[in-house]
């Protein structure tokens, strides 16, 4: 049993398979988490806070905002170091329950047309909702092929029955599945921690899966709507 995404990119991380290159700066809330290299994604939810996955934890992270091609300087980037990295207190590294983390930036990001925040969910999203996942993760489920430019994939939230049948006994109430049971399109290594945005709200964080884009093995995402109170209380107390 191989968990594909449940490690930052230097081990085995998560990436977009079967997607397309995002329109430049169209996902302006997307962050690249770096420690000398890109290892996970994140989402800017305020000028000073980024949401990612707890399995992406490092004590010191450089957050890169306004990025499209992470290999070159495009003039729109903001590089800001973390001052606090806060894993969810109930994160379970064995089953990846509560796979969510907050990063406080050392200074506020400047919000503009290249760097913007994404709204937290006003309510949970129902199955069938169409969403956008993005990241710089692996383009292939079978080999290593990491893109320089941000990739996007439109995908639906799957029913909890489909999710539970794909991963019996492994899906908690803090997870949901999204993608395509027939395979071929999925997030993958290097996408971990990145956004799943539905109707302008951050509903998911890229968490784990079995391989990438495999038949009957959709991607599994942290259910952000369950964490609104933890996010707001953590931000206000830090």
Swiss-Prot record:
Cofactor(s) in the UniProt record: Ca(2+)
Co-factor binding comment: Binds 1 Ca(2+) ion per subunit.
Active site residues per record: 55 (charge relay system), 99 (charge relay system), 192 (charge relay system)
Propeptide: 8-15
Alphabetical UniProt keywords: Calcium, Digestion, Disulfide bond, Hydrolase, Metal-binding, Protease, Secreted, Serine protease, Signal, Zymogen
Primary site of residence: secreted
Record SUPFAM superfamilies: Trypsin-like serine proteases (SSF50494)
PROSITE patterns: TRYPSIN_DOM, TRYPSIN_HIS, TRYPSIN_SER
Domain Peptidase S1: 16-236
GO cellular component annotations of the record: extracellular space
Superkingdom of source: Eukaryota
Residues noted as binding Ca(2+) in the record, renumbered to the chain: 67, 69, 72, 77
Annotated S-S bridges: 22-152, 40-56, 124-225, 131-198, 163-177, 188-212
Alphabetized InterPro entries for the sequence: Peptidase_S1_PA, Peptidase_S1_PA_chymotrypsin, Peptidase_S1A, Serine_Proteases_S1, Trypsin_dom, TRYPSIN_HIS, TRYPSIN_SER
Catalytic EC class: hydrolase
Catalytic activity: Preferential cleavage: Arg-|-Xaa, Lys-|-Xaa
Site (Required for specificity): 186
Gene3D superfamilies, per the entry: Trypsin-like serine proteases
Compartments it resides in: Secreted, Extracellular space
Signal peptide positions (record): 1-7
Family of this protein: Belongs to the peptidase S1 family.
UniProt-recorded name of the protein: Trypsin-3
Species for this entry: Salmo salar (Atlantic salmon)
């Amino acid at each position: 049993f191989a968990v594909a995404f449940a490690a930052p990119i230097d081990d085995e991380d998560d990436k977009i398979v079967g997607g397309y290159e995002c329109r430049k700066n169209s996902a302006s809330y997307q962050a690249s988490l770096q420690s000398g290299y890109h290892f996970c994604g994140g989402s800017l939810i305020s000028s000073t806070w980024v949401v990612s996955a707890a399995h992406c934890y490092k004590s010191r992270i450089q957050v890169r905002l306004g990025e499209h091609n992470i290999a070159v300087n495009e003039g729109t980037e903001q590089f800001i170091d973390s001052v606090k990295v806060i894993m969810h207190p109930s994160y379970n590294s064995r089953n990846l329950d509560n796979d969510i983390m907050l990063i406080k930036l050392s200074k506020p990001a400047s919000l503009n047309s290249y760097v913007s925040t994404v709204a937290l969910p006003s309510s949970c999203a129902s199955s069938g909702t169409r969403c956008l996942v993005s990241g710089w993760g692996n383009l292939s489920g079978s080999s290593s092929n990491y893109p320089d430019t941000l990739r996007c994939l439109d995908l639906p939230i799957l029913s909890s029955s489909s999710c539970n049948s794909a991963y019996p006994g492994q899906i908690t109430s803090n997870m949901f599945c999204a993608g395509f049971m027939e395979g071929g399109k999925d997030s993958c290594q290097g996408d971990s921690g990145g956004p799943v945005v539905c109707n302008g709200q951050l509903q998911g964080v890229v968490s784990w899966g079995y391989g990438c884009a495999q038949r009957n093995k959709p991607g599994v995402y942290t259910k952000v709507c369950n964490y609104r109170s933890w996010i707001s209380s953590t931000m206000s107390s830090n």
